[in-house]
């Protein structure tokens, strides 16, 4: 990303959305120690912040200031950048990061954007998708394919630190009787191509 302020905003947004959607906060105390959400009082306090953020009653910066926290943006590593095909009525411009999950924090989905969760290795998540047990779009699929090459979090982080991240603009391609999201060169994820369902008119 060419503009520093835009780049920093993407990193901050990644940390904020992880907290808002699953309750995982990548942040440090002023002394450099990681924030913990371990005790009953800590869970109650940070759950309250999270509810206020999701309701629009508080800004993320206000929570950080109140708790005197700093964001270790250097612990998020830029991994991939995806843009939806131009013909689609709903488009996204999304960036994926890799990071080690903070210790002493329990993942709790927000019940709105995320209604359930489970921990899976990347290869296991792809297998669940291929069996039709979970849904994914192409950016999720291909990012998991890429990240499944690594045996550990440390390997993924090291690779991301050295990585050049181009923007990938996907396409819609007609395959059989389905519209499928494919890579820019037209190749599809053959094991189970992600079918795009157009919104119904009227």
Model-derived features: where do they sit?
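The catalytic Nudix box helix
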Residues: 1-72, 97
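Conserved aromatic-histidine-acidic binding/catalytic patches
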Residues: 2-10, 48, 85, 89, ...
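Short, well-ordered beta-to-alpha junction loops that form the rim of enzyme active sites
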Residues: 30-31, 81, 140
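Short catalytic/ligand-binding loop motif for oxyanion handling, primarily in non-cytosolic enzymes
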Residues: 34-35, 88, 106-107
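Internal, well-folded beta-alpha domain core
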Residues: 43-44, 57, 117-153, 157-162
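NUDIX/MutT-family hydrolases
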Residues: 62-69, 73-82, 91-104, 109-134
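Core RNA-modification/binding signature centered on pseudouridine synthases
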Residues: 138-202
